[in-house]
């Protein structure tokens, strides 16, 4: 049962990983975490519909919202990202999910702080990550606090010569990278803090495709695969479809799980920095 809860959490929460799509190059990202914001502005608000395949029938199971706001962090200019994903009252009967993720990055898009409060089934946990930089080395301190069931907190610290991201700061920085030089089959590698550990992540660029969202609009998208490797075999976990324009917004996600499939569709967006030039005229 615990494994099923974890998998369902990943199915509805993996929307966050959409930001992983835009790290450039096949080489690991260097420790330099500074970048110029070329993609978003304060006030951006994006909504998604979440679906799950239950016995060959697609059922709407919830919503997710992602907001971006200018703020300060330790008295310095910063951006704050909030992502809320919640199941509907109907699906609460089978599995209750309320996830709230908050991330702060500097005005130069350096990861600063990450927090995930997750109410999933009967479990309630809070994951936190604090980022620091010294002499070209990135360090992250992580802590998981268990509120239900009550357990001892789990803590860890990790340093890397590369930049370390969390699930939201990667979205903030990577959306500004230019993907025009990507080649089909190209692999993108980087470390990411998950709240309890730092894991190596792999994405593969698959090409372009036209995708219809839940706002009756078709978008020209770049397609990426998030993959895992087990015993030397490649397994596709998520397929991302991202707008082929300056906004680089996730339009659709397909998630392949041991117990079924899940999808997330763009429902609405406002406050985007650029026109959605990826829209395909019908």
Whereabouts are the PLM-identified features?
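N-terminal secretory signal peptides that target proteins for export/translocation
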Residues: 1-8
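Sec/Tat signal peptide C-region and signal peptidase I cleavage site
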Residues: 26-31
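Intrinsic-disorder-associated interaction segments
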Residues: 9, 16, 157-160
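Acidic, serine/threonine-rich low-complexity disordered tracts
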Residues: 32-133, 176-282
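Bacterial N-terminal signal peptides
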Residues: 13-24
């Amino acid at each position: 049962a615990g494994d099923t809860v974890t998998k369902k959490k990943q199915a509805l929460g993996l929307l966050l990983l959409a930001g992983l799509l835009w790290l450039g190059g096949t080489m690991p990202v260097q420790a330099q975490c500074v970048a110029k914001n070329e993609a978003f502005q304060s006030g951006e608000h994006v909504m998604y519909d979440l679906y799950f395949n239950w016995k060959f029938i697609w059922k709407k199971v919830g919503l997710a919202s992602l907001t971006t706001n200018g703020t300060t962090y330790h008295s310095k200019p910063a951006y704050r990202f909030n992502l809320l994903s919640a199941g509907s009252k109907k699906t609460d009967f089978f599995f209750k999910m309320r996830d709230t993720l908050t991330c702060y990055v500097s005005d130069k898009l350096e990861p600063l702080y990450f927090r995930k409060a997750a109410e999933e089934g009967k479990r309630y946990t809070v994951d936190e990550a604090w980022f620091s930089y010294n002499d070209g080395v990135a360090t992250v301190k992580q802590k998981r606090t268990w509120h239900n069931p009550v357990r001892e907190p789990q803590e860890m610290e990790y340093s890397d010569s590369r930049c370390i991201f969390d699930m939201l700061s990667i979205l903030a920085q990577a959306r500004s990278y230019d993907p025009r030089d990507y080649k089909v089959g190209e692999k993108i590698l980087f470390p990411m803090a998950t709240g309890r550990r730092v894991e190596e992540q792999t994405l593969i660029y698959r090409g372009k495709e036209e995708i219809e969202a839940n706002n009756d609009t078709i978008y020209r998208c770049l397609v990426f695969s998030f993959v895992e490797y087990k015993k030397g075999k490649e397994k596709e976990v998520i397929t991302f479809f991202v707008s082929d324009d300056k906004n680089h917004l996730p339009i659709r996600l397909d998630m392949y799980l041991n117990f079924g499939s899940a999808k997330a569709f763009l429902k609405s967006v406002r406050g985007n920095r650029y026109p959605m030039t990826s829209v395909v005229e019908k």
